């Protein structure tokens, strides 16, 4: 593979969806943002995803049309095999990844994988979770506790406390720095 798979991870409320939406608005000739296939309604949540029924999801998985798939929070998530075509064509591909399923991505993509962990200070994360209004106070506390204890090892860290524009700029800088380093090896 000639492209890099950027596996973007972060706690719920860390700003992954906003970051990916903004990234899609930027003109990047060799960078694509992959949509996830999810067994939830297209109108649910803020992520731009492809909604599938469980039957559709399992059909795609059974036909090896998903490069990666996992189950979390009562839903099934997948990334289509089209990302492999994009990577082979030399594109870098950004995926809204799962922290718990990073080992699965590492096993499949090995040195082509660039894991990036989006981090937000607890105060800002709490504020974002409260503002979106999807969780009650105890659910917010549980999400904050999980975010504090669950940071993958061996991944680049991107702080998302600042503006969305700053975070996208930082992400693009991280990607380009890794490309330069990889080209020099």
Swiss-Prot record:
Its EC number is 2.7.4.23. Keywords: ATP-binding, Nucleotide-binding, Transferase. One of its GO terms (molecular function) is ribose 1,5-bisphosphate phosphokinase activity. The keyword Nucleotide-binding applies. Pathway: Metabolic intermediate biosynthesis; 5-phospho-alpha-D-ribose 1-diphosphate biosynthesis; 5-phospho-alpha-D-ribose 1-diphosphate from D-ribose 5-phosphate (route II): step 3/3. GO terms for biological process: 5-phosphoribose 1-diphosphate biosynthetic process; organic phosphonate metabolic process. The keyword Transferase applies. Pfam families: AAA_18 (PF13238). It catalyses: alpha-D-ribose 1,5-bisphosphate + ATP = 5-phospho-alpha-D-ribose 1-diphosphate + ADP. Catalyzes the phosphorylation of ribose 1,5-bisphosphate to 5-phospho-D-ribosyl alpha-1-diphosphate (PRPP). Belongs to the ribose 1,5-bisphosphokinase family. This is Ribose 1,5-bisphosphate phosphokinase PhnN. The lineage of its organism: Bacteria, Pseudomonadati, Pseudomonadota, Gammaproteobacteria, Enterobacterales.
């Amino acid at each position: 593979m000639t492209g890099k798979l950027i596996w973007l991870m972060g706690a719920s409320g860390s700003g992954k969806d906003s970051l990916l939406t903004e990234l899609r608005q930027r003109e990047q000739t060799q960078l694509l943002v992959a949509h996830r296939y999810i067994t939830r309604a297209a109108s649910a949540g803020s992520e731009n995803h492809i909604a599938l029924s469980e039957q559709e999801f399992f059909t795609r998985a059974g036909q090896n049309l998903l490069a990666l798939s996992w189950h979390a929070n009562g839903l099934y998530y997948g990334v289509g095999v089209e990302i492999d075509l994009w990577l082979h064509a030399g594109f870098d591909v950004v995926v809204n990844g799962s922290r718990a399923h990073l080992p699965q991505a590492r096993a499949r993509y090995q040195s082509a994988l660039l894991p990036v962990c989006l981090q937000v200070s607890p105060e800002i994360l709490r504020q974002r979770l409260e503002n979106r209004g999807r969780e009650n106070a105890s659910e917010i506390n549980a999400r904050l506790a999980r975010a504090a204890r669950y940071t993958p090892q061996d991944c680049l860290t991107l702080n998302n406390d600042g503006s969305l524009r700053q975070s996208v700029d930082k992400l693009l800088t991280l990607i380009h720095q890794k490309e330069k380093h990889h080209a020099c090896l």
